[in-house]
Amino acid sequence: MENFHAQYVMLETIGHGGCSKVMLARHRLTGSHVAVKMIRKSECWCNPVMSEVELLMMADHPNIISLLQVIETKKKVYLIMELCEGKSLYQHIRNAGYLQEDEARALFKQLLSAMNYCHNQGIVHRDLKPDNIMVEKDGKVKIIDFGLGTQVKPGQKLNLFCGTYPFSAPEVLLSRPYDGPKIDVWTLGVVLYFMVTGKVPFDAASIQKLVRQILAGKYFVPSRLSVELRDLISLLMTANPKLRPTVAEVMVHPWVTEGSGVFPDPCEEQMPLKPNPAIVKAMGYIGFQAQDIEDSLRQRKFNETMASYCLLKKQILKECDRPIRAQPMNPSVTPFPSLVDTSTFHLGLRRRETEPTSLRLSANRQMSVCGRSTSKKRDRRFSWPSVSGRPLHTTHTMDHTHTRTRSVPCIYSMFCTIQPNSSDDSTEGHTSASAEDKPVRSRGWPRGIKGWTRKIGNVMRKLCCCIPSKETSHVGHSRVSPKK
């Protein structure tokens, strides 16, 4: 069984919920930061149809958060995920007030691509909202939370009534068996409305009034929006789910296809059958076997080998995208082995005889993961009430916003009330991030395989992005009704 603390250094807690905690951690071999969701087996009372980890194992799309590794112990399950560099769509819109149609279209097309991929895989999200969508600094979108997701067969009806009230489709609030993909389409409509107005279409002082608004299907839309956009919003939020379009049909709507630009390629980040020889060779110097690397990627084992390869590949791709300057090396930081400089090969072999336990977790994850700042200073952030699988209730949270430097963050629970961060387990393998613990930075990208692999150890870095939030008032609304 793999040892978590032998592979990762815990830095700080960035989210906490009823049966799980999200930590910021550093991968020891590469220095990369990751988000780690720790789930206590004894506290997992939630029981969805399919667990979040199983859905993430199935998903491989450039606009869906990547699961890198799963480590299971007797008491806990560790989900190691990529850490996005950006902030939530909610924060992004709060900073801007609302988005212009061109920017909204660019982001929305990525959401459509991801959700079309999910629906083709039989995956239903059921909790799409701006908090669960990350926007990276380059404008790339990542859907990060599948805690309420499940897998369905064509024509299968669902009866677990969950989600977030302002984004819930009428059929969910009526407690009727529903078509999973169609409620995702409704939610996409609410998200699109929020993107171009800065507000949700349905808002009320109480849950009862909010439910009545949604069931009545009456909402306001700014008169400044184009005719095509208003038509698309109306289609997405069609009250009758049978008349609501599929995601594939939405992708050919005139507003979506307007202008240049293509949809993200679902194959963009799929694992190659053959790993990069340079990375394999570099990993071989610290005990990884080439055949094990290839098998781990091809079979998507989500083990130490797969995580190490993916993190190294991401570092190299990031390094290719921007020039960097050299900095003095921290003597306390061990450089990653280079194929050229054999003096760096004083690392012990990382391989152990045992491989990670094969894992198919029971369906019991109900915690959402959203972006959260690792900085000490935070703004206030707003959270919408949720629809529970139990009797409907409101999850009370404070109205606050917060900037993020890298992404996975706060935990929302549709079933568990959010709890303040506790010290329990926070010291388990915990190591505070030191200001002196800075990676090596090189002058440029050398040519050739040897130069390429030499860069592997010099690409660790820390990013910081602090953007103040502001609100903008909006006027000029006209009442419309969704198509019946």
From Swiss-Prot:
It catalyses: L-seryl-[protein] + ATP = O-phospho-L-seryl-[protein] + ADP + H(+); L-threonyl-[protein] + ATP = O-phospho-L-threonyl-[protein] + ADP + H(+). Residues 272-314 form the UBA domain. Residues 8-256 form the Protein kinase domain. The active site is at residue 127. Residues 356-400, 422-450 are annotated as: Disordered. PROSITE patterns: PROTEIN_KINASE_DOM (PS50011), PROTEIN_KINASE_ST (PS00108). Residues 356-373, 422-434 have a biased composition (Polar residues). One of its GO terms (molecular function) is protein kinase activity. PANTHER family: MAP/MICROTUBULE AFFINITY-REGULATING KINASE (PTHR24346), SPERM MOTILITY KINASE 3A (PTHR24346:SF95). This is Sperm motility kinase 2B. The lineage of its organism: Eukaryota, Metazoa, Chordata, Craniata, Vertebrata. The gene is Smok2b.
